[in-house]
Amino acid sequence: MMTEAYFEPLGTDDGWEVFRATPHTVSAWGPDLQHGAPPSALLTRAMDRLDPSDETRIARVAVDLLGPVPLGELRTRARVTRPGRRIQLVESELEARGRMVARASAWRMLVSDTAEVEQTLDQPRRLPGADHNSEFFNRWTSGYIDSLEIRGAEDGTVWARPTLPLVAGEETTPAEHVMCVADIANGVGAVLEPHEWRFLNTDVITHLHRRPVGQWIGVTARASIGPDGVGATTGTLFDEVGAIGHTLQALLIERV
């Protein structure tokens, strides 16, 4: 029976946490590859749960996808590379079949009360009703995409809610939850037809100016395509209260 989560925990091994990726992580680009979102969230998990404190939170996550992330057994570990009471830099790595397939870094910052000066450039977006299914994702199918409940708003925002936990038996943290969704910006912002072009992202960099609340994450995004096979997707992330941050992805553009 398939585990109803993106990853199944298998224990620890010499400082590494070991997991098995389930078919719910499968990418639309190939049946043996993971979508970028689940491994990005798993790397975030390793950093988020390393010496956690209520006095700090993740402000930025930068994930580098070093190659195709396969299904099967994976290992993660994390370390603090810049300790500090107010600002910390944390790094994590993801290994599969004896090679590093992805790595990440995160800035953790001291939290304090700045509610009186809170502001953002982006206006809140309204979560549409259950009858608003996103037609865009009808072009895509995969284990990962099928694990999302998706709604499309008239203003172009795509709202997504993962229906599975990141790791079986665990409650997904807010930072992990955002990273379970942020990588879909590449698809949301696509300006090329996927049956004619591949637009693979090699990274996902996410800044969070506010801790997300609730289960739904809204994404607005747009790709820019250069003349030489390179592009970039820029996106804004929302919860039902308003904007929570921004995301950026580098793209490799190739004809199918």
Question: Which residues does each predicted region cover?
Answer:
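Terminal targeting signals and extreme-terminal segments of soluble enzymes
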Residues: 1-256
